Amino acid sequence: MTKRTRILIITRNLPPLVGGMERLNWHMADELSRYAEVKVVGPKGSAALKPEQVILTESPLKPLPLFLLVSLLKAMWLAIRWRPDVILAGSGLTAPLAWIASKLCGARSAAYLHGFDITVKDKLYQSIWAPFFKKLDHVIVNSTPTKELAIAAKVREEKINIVHPGVTLPEAPQPEDRIRAFKEKYGLADKKILLSVGRLTTRKGLREFVELALPGIVQAEPEAIVVVIGDAPKNALGAGIQTAESIQQQAARSGVAEHIKFLGVMIDQSTLAIAYEAADVHVFPVRHIPDDPEGFGMVAIEAAAHGLPSAAFTTGGIVDAVRHGESGFLAEKNNYAELSLHVLQLLQHPVTKERIQSFAQGFAWAHFGEGVLSALR
């Protein structure tokens, strides 16, 4: 009987923490467990939500130095006792841990990197963490722009593989009565819903969208309303925040206070699916900040899976996550006038759901898992 490959994943990004990186790491462990024995060193609270076939050991989430120390010790213990074939860091944060532990058992070392993993402007991180990227045997990146950043960070190109994040494809459309009930519950009947999903950070740029794009959209489409699902992150590392209060205050200053509604964090996936299918456009106004790039833009793929088009800027990995004219429209970075026109175009001349969903099918989590497994060989 052929021995199954053993993969040890070290990550701080797992549910119950909320965000794209958390979903990605969960699915990475889940998909790899279909082909290999998978163990994970993750944050406190993640064991209760782990994939069924995965064995997970927890480390304290905070303070960060304690998480890193405990995770390193646990990874070293597993390296010696379990002898994994591959030790994979779920982000740049745990890349040094993966490399160090790999040296104890002869395993191949790897990391899945996002753009911010490489560009974060922290002297300690850049002097200690970043140099480990080029030492790894394999570097997996989430987009073409992230690959370019990795090469600029002196990672050899032959070590790098692009594996785009995945998406859960819905088995069927949401029932019309549930969509109608959702709209009635939140006072959205007969509204043109511009949906924003995700953490409220400086990079995501929702406050700037409200100031620079929403007034013109509302002038042309008086029933337009931005519906925000998400909140400012509490445990994210290195992310500047925009509070819901600051965005609402900007809406008041811009004369569009009645055209934005905050629904908070939505954990229930069925309700989130209804929100996607109730909406008319997914607005994804990520700002172009060279030191804080958007690595990919998973939420755009999630929207596309439900037939919802995105309006976004051509910045970071979004150029891989949104296909212009097929799953939405892309405006030149930080060009809010052009972004407004694209939103109006999608409201007035919608792209067919079938075309949008066809694009999303190429990002199924099964494809993601196969890509990661191939990159680790």
Placement of each model-derived feature along the sequence:
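Conserved donor-binding/catalytic core segment of Leloir-type glycosyltransferases
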Residues: L8-I10, L188-K204, V210, L214-P215, ...
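A charged, aromatic-enriched C-terminal amphipathic alpha-helix characteristic of glycosyltransferases
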Residues: Y35, N334, Q348-R377
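Short His-centered aromatic/hydrophobic patch
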Residues: A89-A95
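A short, active-site helix/loop in glycosyltransferases that binds the activated sugar's phosphate group
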Residues: L136-K159, V167-A172
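Nucleotide-activated donor-binding/catalytic signature segment of Leloir-type glycosyltransferases, i.e.
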Residues: G230, A239-M266, S270
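Short hydrophobic beta-strand element within catalytic cores of glycosyltransferases
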Residues: A300-A305, P309-A312, V322
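Conserved acidic donor-binding segment of nucleotide-sugar-dependent glycosyltransferases
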Residues: R323-G325, F329-Y336, V343-P350
